[in-house]
Amino acid sequence: MNLSIFLFLIGILGFILNRKNIILMIIAIEIMLLAVTLLVLISSFGFDDNVGQTFSLYIISIAGAESVIGLSILVAFYRLFLVLNYL
């Protein structure tokens, strides 16, 4: 549980400190989502519940789809403006 909280705080810190780099912001969001997934998995193993393990698979698949959408928007932004920093 402490590891997932630590990872979530690293993700928040990375999101706040890298406001000018969109790729690092997407990576920080992915770290936060994986920290939540780790917490769900730890809780499901602790309570002997298979629903939490299934829910963690959904979280991972949604996080993957979110990163694909974010990176495709980033590629479209780069093709229009030829720069990745938005400030």
UniProtKB/Swiss-Prot annotation:
Topology term for the membrane: Multi-pass membrane protein
One GO cellular component term: mitochondrial inner membrane
BP GO terms, sorted: ATP synthesis coupled electron transport
Tagged with keyword Transmembrane: yes
Compartment(s): Mitochondrion inner membrane
Reactions mediated catalytically: a ubiquinone + NADH + 5 H(+)(in) = a ubiquinol + NAD(+) + 4 H(+)(out)
Organism for this UniProt entry: Moniliophthora perniciosa (strain FA553 / isolate CP02) (Witches'-broom disease fungus)
Keyword vocabulary terms for this entry: Electron transport, Membrane, Mitochondrion, Mitochondrion inner membrane, NAD, Respiratory chain, Translocase, Transmembrane, Transmembrane helix, Transport, Ubiquinone
Record-annotated membrane-spanning stretches: 1-21, 22-42, 57-77
InterPro entries per UniProt: NADH_UbQ_OxRdtase_chain4L/K (IPR001133), NUOK/Mnh_C1-like (IPR039428)
Function: Core subunit of the mitochondrial membrane respiratory chain NADH dehydrogenase (Complex I) which catalyzes electron transfer from NADH through the respiratory chain, using ubiquinone as an electron acceptor.
Pfam families assigned: Oxidored_q2
The EC number(s) this enzyme carries: 7.1.1.2
Broad class of enzyme this protein falls into: translocase
Gene name of this polypeptide: ND4L
Subunit field text: Core subunit of respiratory chain NADH dehydrogenase (Complex I) which is composed of 45 different subunits.
Family statement: Belongs to the complex I subunit 4L family.
Protein name: NADH-ubiquinone oxidoreductase chain 4L
Record GO terms (molecular function): NADH dehydrogenase (ubiquinone) activity
